[in-house]
Design a protein with these regions (language model features):
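Glycine-rich and small/hydrophobic secondary-structure elements
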Residues: 139-141
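Positively charged n-region of N-terminal signal peptides that target proteins for export
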Residues: 1-4
């Protein structure tokens, strides 16, 4: 589950049929409430791409990543391959730590438990160590 560390850095788009639990707009609205978040862009420079490769174990596929920001809080929507199919996940990050993780869309035929609060709560307050590993162990399905 090292790909979660990339919530701060990288995502890659996929367009397969999915069971949608939250739309992107619902996730962003829930992250910031009445506060207006600004849509920003993280460009995949050589340095960012190298960091992403260390975290994910593969190179990024796009040249930029859009995210939302208000103050020190950011919201990221990322797509990453689960066992076989893409999973769309949302992460609210504040002060370098994941405050909330959500599954927005799930495309796998098994492992649906990942969308439940009992599984997702293990990501709360998770951050990156200097070596790009997570500072907490994450249990997989």
């Amino acid at each position: 589950m090292r790909w979660i560390g990339l919530a701060i850095i990288l995502a890659s788009p996929f367009s397969l049929q999915a069971e949608v639990y939250l739309t992107s707009q619902q996730f962003v609205d829930g992250a910031f409430g009445a506060n207006t978040a600004k849509l920003e862009t993280l460009w995949m420079t050589k340095e960012v791409a190298a960091q992403s490769d260390k975290i994910l174990g593969h190179a990024p596929k796009q040249s930029r990543l859009r995210y939302w920001k208000s103050g020190l809080k950011t919201a990221w929507i990322l797509d990453e391959i689960g066992k076989e199919e893409p999973i769309t996940a949302g992460f609210i990050v504040e002060n370098g730590k994941i405050m909330q993780a959500s599954i927005l869309a799930y495309r796998e035929s098994r492992g649906w438990e990942v969308r439940h609060a009992n599984f997702l709560k293990q990501y709360q307050n998770v951050g990156l160590l200097p070596d790009y590993f997570l500072n907490k162990n994450i249990d997989g399905i």
